[in-house]
Amino acid sequence: EIGSGLVGSEMCIRDSLELFISLAKSAKQEGVMAIEKRANEIEDPFTRSTLAMVADGFSADFIYEVAESDIKQMEERHRAGALIFSQCGMYAPTLGVLGAVIGLIAALGNLSDIDKLGHSIAAAFVATLLGIFTGYVCWHPFANKLKRISAEEVEIKKMILEGALALQGNASSIAIEAKLQAFIPVSERKSMRD
């Protein structure tokens, strides 16, 4: 559904563009009630509430303030979630080194037993390797992916807000398409017209 998922944001952008072009045409022919009717059919809460404000006749300033506040709150939640994984990535190598120190202390306690000495040194190296591996191969990439997904979702919501404000200002479908094309990479704009 439009703007409902984090995966496949291009499809959400395409759907959003098509939605607002369609809404502008419907509003021109049927009036504001067409926007309200379509808003009730949309599953995405942000899109639905923003369009409901347009249909209810709220001012552009009010719609902008409410939607922008919603976007900022979402960004903060996403930032806090990504921060947890970033911190895990920072601490994992340190914990690996701590495991190495503990393994070496155990090795020093077993200097007389060669078999135990080898196992303790191996455990020390494994702890270091796991700490570095999880930090740089798991936690940091996951945090970066969350940040990228969040940025894409913010762009989609900003596009939806711009489309809603254009509808509120009675912009034509051509004007809305031109305005919302700014959210689409230039290389993909031609394919959007096909």
Residue ranges and their predicted role:
Residues 1-8, 12-13:
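Single conserved hydrophobic/aromatic residue that forms the stacking wall/gate
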Residues 9-10, 32-37, 144-150:
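A ubiquitous short alpha-helical element
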Residues 13-45, 165-190:
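Acidic, Ser/Thr-rich low-complexity segments on the non-lumenal side of membrane proteins
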Residues 16-26, 49, 53, 103, ...:
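Solvent-exposed, amphipathic alpha-helical segments
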Residues 20-98:
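Structured inter-helical modules in multipass membrane proteins
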Residues 70-149:
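Helix-termination/interfacial motifs at the ends of transmembrane alpha-helices
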Residues 116-189:
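Channel- or pocket-lining gating/hinge segments that regulate access to a cavity or pore
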Residues 192-194:
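C-terminal membrane-proximal segments flanking the terminal transmembrane helix
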